[in-house]
Amino acid sequence: MSRRTDIESALRRLAPRIPDHEFGAVLDHALDSRGLRQAAPEEAAWLSLVAYVRHVFTDYDGLRDQDFDEDSARFFVAEEIEAVLTGWGVRRRLATED
């Protein structure tokens, strides 16, 4: 199987109810991110999913623009991220480093 197929499968398992247009954006991020090229497909799918939700569905970037450090900004948006992920059928929970 190709890396694309492996990540697609991992993402479908992680987020079975993710809308198709969001699925494509998360998949593209997982495939295009230099930092994820060596990651296992499951890890690439998870990290891309969390990053996508953080930047698209929360005020994370606004908090960073207000000089919140990365950890603080992530803390303040964690519940919003969890809500979106839960809506997409994700059972995995955020870890402190996510």
Label every PLM stretch briefly.
Residues 1-98:
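Structure-specific DNA junction-binding interface
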